[in-house]
Amino acid sequence: MSLGLVGRKVGMTRIFTAEGDSIPVTVVDVSDNRVTQIKTVETDGYTAVQVAFGSRRASRVTKPLAGHLAKAGVEAGEILKEFRIDAAKAAELSNGAIVGPDLFEVGQKVDVQGVSIGKGYAGTIKRYNFGSGRASHGNSRSHNVPGSIGMAQDPGRVFPGKRMTGHMGDVTVTVQNLEIARIDAERKLLLVKGAIPGAKGGKVFVTPAVKTKGAK
């Protein structure tokens, strides 16, 4: 139950430490995070903060959403995201408030959620790291086949979850315990150590890590 930020994946680069070590980082733009609604137990049954990110033309906003944003006095955003927080933290915020990168600090562990890059239809070797069959010595036209997918009459079906060919990627992925290597407060950028899910320009959600115990 912690407040997070909505960001846009800019791309990857590297930074250098004082010792000269090269650290690969992903640049995340977290500008224009603005509060559009504060939900409370009394009115909504739970406590949360709704945040808008980015911009959207007024002609592309539905009338109910336009009324909702007008009530908060906030411009339409490209995306709305809700974060569950405690009542004490919610009391410190108000509609229209800007939430910036100062929410985090350098060295803090965070979880980053995004939609992975779609790879299209893929075989089991690419999708699940299956091994190929033998190149020769009795193998004819069965070099990259997945093999058996089950038994015969008993049980007479393919078990759910069987790893087979299919669409790869384009799914929601959360990478946990990434470290914030640097914060550019002026340009409102987070530099996260390592890679995060998604393509350049993709939307990501950055929240404080929930499994910090034992994290390296």
Curated annotation (Swiss-Prot):
GO biological process: translation
Keywords: Methylation, Ribonucleoprotein, Ribosomal protein, RNA-binding, rRNA-binding
Pfam families per record: Ribosomal_L3
Gene3D superfamilies for the chain: 3.30.160.810, Translation factors
This protein's record includes keyword Cell inner membrane: no
A GO cellular component entry from the record: cytosolic large ribosomal subunit
Top-level taxon: Bacteria
Quaternary context: Part of the 50S ribosomal subunit. Forms a cluster with proteins L14 and L19.
N5-methylglutamine PTM sites in chain numbering: Q153
A GO term, aspect molecular function: structural constituent of ribosome
Entry-linked PANTHER family: 50S RIBOSOMAL PROTEIN L3, LARGE RIBOSOMAL SUBUNIT PROTEIN UL3C
Posttranslational modification: Methylated by PrmB.
HAMAP family listed in its UniProt record: Ribosomal_uL3_B
Protein name: Large ribosomal subunit protein uL3
Similarity annotation: Belongs to the universal ribosomal protein uL3 family.
